[in-house]
């Protein structure tokens, strides 16, 4: 049976991630771009999105009004900021449209709200949509089961100078994966390195977080398991944003006909592999 085409709306269409998503949608035989959304008063509203991002003329004009586009898409993909994400989430909730959330930096209260919206629409929320990082989560879980009680654990993350949340959402997801295996509450077992002089030796049963913001680093995450005898280092590096975009688009296709619920990339990997 022929697979149903997924019609996708992209928010932040003229941003770095938005442009990569649109280019990858054009390459995917199972998807079509039907809405390219930007903020109000954007100077390119009304112009052809394809021409503006260098892929040739498309059938989609840049818009700031999701109400105009609401009948033209099945799934919305959002990689913006929490405030923008919630605006679009409320619209998707009202229109009964499914949504992919790639934004990070939500508060606990905002996460609870997202969970409540998933009772009516289908959502996939992930801090990182690359297949590689989601495989890293699985490796981390297995390593933690064996070494978690005998090692100091550290997460070191590197991103571009414009990333505003510290630590990264992916680093926190790694920490949550470790905490789940160890039966810890992450916020009670986190150690954030700052300037100063340590007054005591490092506490046990803590996950150390270090963040670097520099240049145009797409994303790199290293997890260390260090004991007095040896060290295991597990690293994932993203060379470009295409890996995130491809994963998000696969997520959109997967969630297209789901009725409701909150899902993550692990749900998709279970189906695919």
Swiss-Prot record:
Keyword Transmembrane: no
Major place of residence: cytoplasm
Residue positions of the active site: 159 (proton donor/acceptor), 163 (proton donor)
Domain of life: Bacteria
Residue positions binding (S)-2,3,4,5-tetrahydrodipicolinate: 160, 169-170
Catalyzed reactions per annotation: (S)-2,3,4,5-tetrahydrodipicolinate + NAD(+) + H2O = (2S,4S)-4-hydroxy-2,3,4,5-tetrahydrodipicolinate + NADH + H(+); (S)-2,3,4,5-tetrahydrodipicolinate + NADP(+) + H2O = (2S,4S)-4-hydroxy-2,3,4,5-tetrahydrodipicolinate + NADPH + H(+)
GO molecular function, one term: oxidoreductase activity, acting on CH or CH2 groups, NAD or NADP as acceptor
Record NCBIfam families: dapB
Purpose of the protein: Catalyzes the conversion of 4-hydroxy-tetrahydrodipicolinate (HTPA) to tetrahydrodipicolinate.
Name of the protein described by the UniProt record: 4-hydroxy-tetrahydrodipicolinate reductase
């Amino acid at each position: 049976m022929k697979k149903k085409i997924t019609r996708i709306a992209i928010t932040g269409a003229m941003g770095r991630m938005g442009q990569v998503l649109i280019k990858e949608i054009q390459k995917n035989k199972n998807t079509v771009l039907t809405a390219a959304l930007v903020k109000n008063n954007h100077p390119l509203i009304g112009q052809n999105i394809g021409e503006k991002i260098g892929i040739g003329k498309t059938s989609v004009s840049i818009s700031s009004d999701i109400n105009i586009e609401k009948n033209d898409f099945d799934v919305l993909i959002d990689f913006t900021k929490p405030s923008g994400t919630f605006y679009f989430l409320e619209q998707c909730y009202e229109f009964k449209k499914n949504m992919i959330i790639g934004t990070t930096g939500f508060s606990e209260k905002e996460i609870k709200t997202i969970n409540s919206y998933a009772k009516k629409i289908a959502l996939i929320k992930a801090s990182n949509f690359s297949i590689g990082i989601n495989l890293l989560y699985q490796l981390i879980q297995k390593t933690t089961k064996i070494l978690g009680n005998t090692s100091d654990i550290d997460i070191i993350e590197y991103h571009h100078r414009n990333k505003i949340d510290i630590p990264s959402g992916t680093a926190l997801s790694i920490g949550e994966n470790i905490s789940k295996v160890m039966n810890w509450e992450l916020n009670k077992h986190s150690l954030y390195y700052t300037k100063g002089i340590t007054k005591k030796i490092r506490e046990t049963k803590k996950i150390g977080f270090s963040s670097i913001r520099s240049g145009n680093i797409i994303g790199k995450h290293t997890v260390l398991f260090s004991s007095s005898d040896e060290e295991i280092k597990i690293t994932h590096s993203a060379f470009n944003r295409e890996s995130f975009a491809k994963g998000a688009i696969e997520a959109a296709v997967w969630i297209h006909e789901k009725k409701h619920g909150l899902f993550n990339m692990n749900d998709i990997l279970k189906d695919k592999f």
